[in-house]
């Protein structure tokens, strides 16, 4: 059997179905296939990919902090600050879920305050960032955080391609939901089998 990297190189770019099929065939995690594809497309090694991905989130993580620290949005007011004051576990009775909600809305509010970057106002980076920030709060290690970020971006990028080719806005919470579902499966050690 050919090595994974050479097979991925032949098929670039990979669909999600191809990504899952290769993970199953080679007995690796889906994120390992995503990272292999990223290494080939960027020329970076795995650590370089993980570092670069987290650097892309720096702006939105700053937006989250503004959003939960009194940021005020023309659309959402001060909802994240109010959620923070209520404390985790009060909306869904689940700390991680409450934090993910709070930080997702905080990313939106913060971006309304400081300007939207790198997204074009489509909303998909806000759920990704909210979920990552919640994972940070519950003590998820840096490597796992970066792997989750890569996986969410892979799923989200497929929605962006669909938007470009169909003209339909498939991003926003649609991409966010699918990306976070994939990330949750990864975090729970789910497999393609």
Question: What name fits each language-model region?
Answer:
Residues 2-177, 188-193:
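N-terminal core-entry segment
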Residues 183:
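N-terminal Rossmann-like FAD-binding beta1-loop-alpha1 element of flavoenzymes
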């Amino acid at each position: 059997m050919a090595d994974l990297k050479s097979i991925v190189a032949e098929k670039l770019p990979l669909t999600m179905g191809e990504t899952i099929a290769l993970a199953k065939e080679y007995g690796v995690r889906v994120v390992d296939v995503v990272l292999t594809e990223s290494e080939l497309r960027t020329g970076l090694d795995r650590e370089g990919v993980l570092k670069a991905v987290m650097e892309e989130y720096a702006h939105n993580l700053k937006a989250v902090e503004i959003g939960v620290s009194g940021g005020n949005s023309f659309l959402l007011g001060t909802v994240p600050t109010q959620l923070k004051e209520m404390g985790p576990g009060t909306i869904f009775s689940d700390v991680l879920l409450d934090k993910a909600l709070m930080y997702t809305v905080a990313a939106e509010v913060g971006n309304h305050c400081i300007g939207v970057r790198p997204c074009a106002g489509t909303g998909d980076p806000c759920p990704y960032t909210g979920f990552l920030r919640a994972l940070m709060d519950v003590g998820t290690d840096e490597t796992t955080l970066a792997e989750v970020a890569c996986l969410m971006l892979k799923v989200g990028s497929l929605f962006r391609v669909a938007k470009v080719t169909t003209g339909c806005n498939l991003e926003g919470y649609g991409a966010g939901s699918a990306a976070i579902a994939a990330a949750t499966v990864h975090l729970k050690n789910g497999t393609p089998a």
